[in-house]
Structure formats: C-alpha cells, structure tokens
Amino acid sequence: WLLGMNLDSRRNIVSYEIGAAKIQSRAYFDKKDELPMYESFPGWEGLSAALQAKGYDSAPRFVFSGTLYSRSGTAPMVFNAVDPGREARLLRYPAFLEAGRFPEAGKPELALGALAAEKLKVGIPLRPTKAELEELAAAAPTGEDAAFVLSLYGPPPAKAKGAKTSVFENKDPARAAAEAAKLALKEGATKAELDRLWAILAASGRMDVRIATTIDLKAAPESIRGAKFEGELLPALGPEARARALAAYEKDPLTGDYRLAAPGTAEAGAVQDDMAASGFSGAIRHVNQLVDAVVVGVVNSPNPKTNGNVGFIPLDALQDESGLMLAGRVTELLVRKAGADDSALPGKDESPEAIAAAVAAELPEGLAVRGWRDYVADFLAAYNGDNVSTRLMVFFLFLLSFIGIANTMLMAILERTKETGMLRALGMTDGEVLLAYVLEAGLIGAIGSAFGVAAGCLMNIPMVAQGIDYSAVSKEMGGDFGYRITTLFKSAWNPLAIALTGVGATLLSAAAAVPPSLRALRMPVTDSLRFE
C-alpha cells in the first residue's frame, strides 16, 4: 500500500508539479521557501532553445506570493506566472479543469486551485446553499439568465442503497445536516450549459479578482549611514565583495555617510548582488503592487499541490509597470524530456547532470540544474516517516511470529523427548536429528507462509484496482498532507517483497526449531528415554 502511494505521488510530482528538473539561480534555491523575487534571472529564452535542440521541453515560471481578493473574501496565495503553451506541453494539470479554461497568453487571466476557488466563492459553485443560489440568480444580467441558473441546481441525489461511504467521512450530525440542506449542480449538465453558466457568473462580476503583492527588487542604496556601512555591511561581505563596496561608495567627510559614486553602472550592479547575497537589509527595495485579473478556470488535478491556494497567470501579462515589472526575468525554468511517458519516472537522460551537460555552453554562471527530489522535502519527510513506521511494524510482526513458532516447536520437541532419545539410540547423529526437526519446522512455516502470502495477495487485488477513498481526509487537511494524492490511495504489486516474505517466514520457522532442538540434544540418551 505504501509503495502504491509512493509511486503515484512521485509520478504526480513529475507530471503535474515540477517536471524532471528545474534551472534556478543558486541564490534563489538557498532561499526558495521565501520565494525571493529579486533572485530571478533573464535570458531564459536562450536556455530554452538550447534545451529544445537537445530534445527537452522547458517552461519558464515566475513564482511569487500575495493575497487574492474576491467579492466574497480574501486568501493568501502562491502565484505561478507561466507560459500557457509551454506549461501545457511539459505538465498535465492544465488539462484537469473542473470548470472554465486555462488562461491565454497576454491576458490578465487567472486559473485557481479548486480549494482556493471554493474559499473565495469564485467559479461555478457545486454545492451552494439556497440563499447563495438566489444571490447568483439575482446577479444575472437578464431574467432568462436567472431562470437558467436556477434550472441547473436541485436537491442532491440520494445515495443508492448499499453505496459505499468513505470510512474517513466526518460523521458530525450538524455538518451532515448542513451538507444535506445544500443544493447540487445537476449531474447531467453539458459543457455548453456549464460554459453559459460561467459566462453569466463572469458578467455578474463573480470572477473579478485583485492580486495584492509586494515586488522585491535589488537596489544598491544611494546613501548608507556610516555606522551601518562599516558595522553591518562590510563585516558581512567577503574580501572581494568588500573591496567592490569600498570602491563603489565614497565617504562624505562631513556626515560620515557613504554615497554611491556611479548609480546604474555594472559596478553598482555587482555591489547590489553582493549586498543581496549577504542578506543586507538595505539591498532590497519593496514596492506594493495591485494587479486586477479575471478568473477563467478552476484546476482540480490528481496532484493536490495544484488544487490548493495557488493561481496560474500568463507570464507575459506581468512584464510591464501594470504587472510585476519583470523585464523578461523568471525565477525558474522547468525541464522534461520531450515525449516523456507520464507513467515513468525521469531516467538518466533527465538527471540534473545530463541536463546540465546538454546546456553547459549556455548555462550562465550562478545558475544550476536541480532534480525534482530537491523540491519535495514535505513528501520525502512523510514517506520516510511512514516507511520507518512500516518497518517497525513488520519487525514486531516477525518477532511475534518467531516467539509463537518457537513456543510451538518447544512444546512439540518436548513432547517427543523419548522419540528423540530412541532415534539417537538407533544410531542417528545429533546433526541428523537437528536437521530433521529444522526441516519439519521449515515445512510447517512454508505451508503457513504460502497461505499467508495467498491471503495477502487476494486482499491486495481490490487495493490495487479500487484503493481506499481518502477524499474526506484530504478535504479536512486542506488537500495537502505530504503525499501528492487527492482521493484514492491505491496499493501496488511488489513481487520482490512478496517473495522475500514467503522465504523469510520459512527460514524464520526453521530457525525457531534450533533452540529447543539443541536443548533436547544436550540431554543424555538414557535420560531422554526415561523422560515423562
């Protein structure tokens, strides 16, 4: 089961979230959890062309955080500014839209994760209350549109008799009653009807949102107080960076402050990079920015990372002063082999080393290629923790089995002490008697393990085919609990583990016969024959 969750999560990370690798600046990677916009890089087009010539797809991104405002609320978000065409070629989530469409290049359009859309009441509501539906109808442009909106909703369909319910479903009566009182979008709604409903809701202003963010820009201060320059900046710099700073700034003999001698030059740019790398607070300029956008789609893919508080907006819509003033810069370039199989994990030709070698001539200093595993610490922590727990459980199960088998063999050999003495009196060596008991115990273990493995395989068949519905757990945890799975946790076949289990159980049973057999063989033959 854990193997199935692990494999599905790895595939979903590669196919829906990251690709095989990312090209980023080393400085950005060191602070990636902070999403440092100022550590972006230009010239990604040349890298992309070089990758394409070597048989790789690539997709640029500019990742930033902010707050999204809708008519009904606000939510903290992570935004991915993407190239829609390249993104769709490399990753698969743009095809998994719950409603609407993916944003088009050059337009201030936004696709939201399903959970964010639900929180902000954006998109097509699937389970509105009666009051919410009446509000939607009242906001429709015409009476005909209002009637159309009302016609698409009705009471939720009753569960079929005997229908399966998730074992993890919340059984709170109050919550169940509230859910039962909600209406539901009719199951037979066609794409044309949903598109018309989306257009009506968009015309009412439901899809209008505003992004509030802070643009972080590297900027060498034109003036720095002397105490701060000498006491904070210079000690944080290396010898070469310190020399550049002293050459770029001149000390005012009257005030003692340091002033930038030549703003806008290459030397000033090098100094501002040194300041940012050292963490000097004055090297980053913060600019508050508002960006108006329209939500055109809701993403609901098999990877929960694309379905949470995340938004996707065209990269070219944020280039100028009305956006983020990107000037062609990106924070990362996703990479995947062209035509790669979604069911397969990246191979050697998609390793960071292979990708770096393919673009070595075009890869600027300061940029590095890193594999997808470097970006999924949450998943690896969850998997490793569960793996340790599983190993401990297996260890204790084997320990209990060993104790049970050893106790059974002890009683069996103890009851046959006279038989053991008779065999030894008839000429069998101690080794032959020991071998007989070990083979007997091993055969018993083999029969038991065969039944156990067969029962386990039979139980695993529905686990592989259907899995366990964890959608209720996923929803309660906001869709993000480490593993990149949204609803069904499926098992997988592991022939090696199955074979090792059978062989291990057989050997364990045989080993359990050794201690009581040796105890019986240490008894003199005469005492064995008189044993009662």
Residue spans for each PLM region:
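Solvent-exposed, non-transmembrane alpha-helical starts
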Residues: 32-42, 69-71, 76, 88-92, ...
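Short, solvent-exposed hinge/capping segments at secondary-structure junctions
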Residues: 91-92, 112-127
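Hydrophobic alpha-helical transmembrane segments of multi-pass inner-membrane transport and secretion
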Residues: 1-5, 384-419, 442-455, 503-511
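Short helix-loop junctions at transmembrane helix boundaries
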Residues: 5, 451-500
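C-terminal membrane-exit region of the final transmembrane helix in multipass inner-membrane proteins
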Residues: 488-532
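Hydrophobic, regular-secondary-structure patches
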Residues: 1-78, 88, 94-106, 186-187, ...
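Mechanotransmission and gating elements of multispan inner-membrane complexes involved in transport
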Residues: 159-390
